[in-house]
Amino acid sequence: MTSNDSHRYRVAIVGGAGMWGRHYLTAAAEHEQCDAILVDTSDRRDEFAAHHNVTDVYSTLEELFAVEVPDVVCCILPVQVAPAMVLACVEAGVKVVSCEKPIAIELAEADRIVNTCRDKGVAFGCATAHWEVPLLDETAAWLASGEFGDITSVAIPGGLPVEVSGAGCVQLTQMRGLTGAEVEWVEGYELPSVGAYRAEEASDIEADCPAYGRLGLSNGVICEIPQPRDEMRIPCRVSVTTTQGRL
C-alpha cells in the first residue's frame, strides 16, 4: 500500500500470535508506514516475531506501557478479557484502539467502553461483521425496498456451533442488518463450552458456548437457530424467506 503520508505509526497487536490476531500482525508488519509490536504470551510468540522481523516483543500491556505508549493498539483477545485491555489502553493514552467482536459480553459494558473512548477522544473500532460479506448492505436495501415481498421467516441455518457472543455475533449482526429488525425475545438452550474457544481466565458465567433456539424479532418474524450438528456444517450465514422466495 502506498500513501503520500510519510508518518510512521507504532502499532501493537495484543494476541498477535493467536488464531485471529496473526492476521492483524501480518497486516501491521507488511504495511510500509507501520512498525509492528507483538504482545503475546503463547509458546509460538517468538516464532511469529522472527517470521515478521518484529523486534519489539512483550508479554503484557503493562510491560509495553512501561517502555512506550504506541500510536495504535489492536486487542485481539477473547471477549471475556478484551474489555479490560481496551480500557487499559485508553487510560495509558493510546489514541487509536481496536478489538475483535464483540466488544463485551454485556451491552452495558460495551456502552461504557464506547462512551469512555468518546470522552477521552480515542478513535475506537471493532471487527468487520457488516462488510466481510460482499453486497450485504445492498441485499439489505433490496429486502427493505419490498421488491422481494414481505419477510415471512428468518433462519441461521448453520446454528451457533461454537459461540453465541464471539463467533455467533457475526451471524446475529448480519441477520439484524438484513431484516432491519431487532431481537425482542429469546427462547433457547445452551450447550457445553467448546474447549479451544474458552479463555482460561473466564469464569463459568463468562464462558461462551454454542446454543440453539428461536429469536422473536421486532417485525413480528421469528428467527430459527437449529441445534448445531458436528457432521453437517452449513456455510450459509443467514437465510431470509419472503413472500416472493428465499435469499
What are these regions (language model features)?
Residues 25-26, 46, 62, 172-176:
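Active-site phosphate/pyrophosphate- and oxyanion-stabilizing loops and adjacent acidic/basic residues
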Residues 7-9, 95, 122, 152:
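Nucleotide donor/acceptor-binding cores
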Residues 52-116:
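Beta-loop-alpha module in the N-terminal Rossmann-like domain of NAD(P)-dependent dehydrogenases
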Residues 65, 72, 103-172:
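A contiguous active-site-proximal alpha/beta segment in oxidoreductase catalytic domains
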Residues 1-52:
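N-terminal Rossmann-like dinucleotide-binding module
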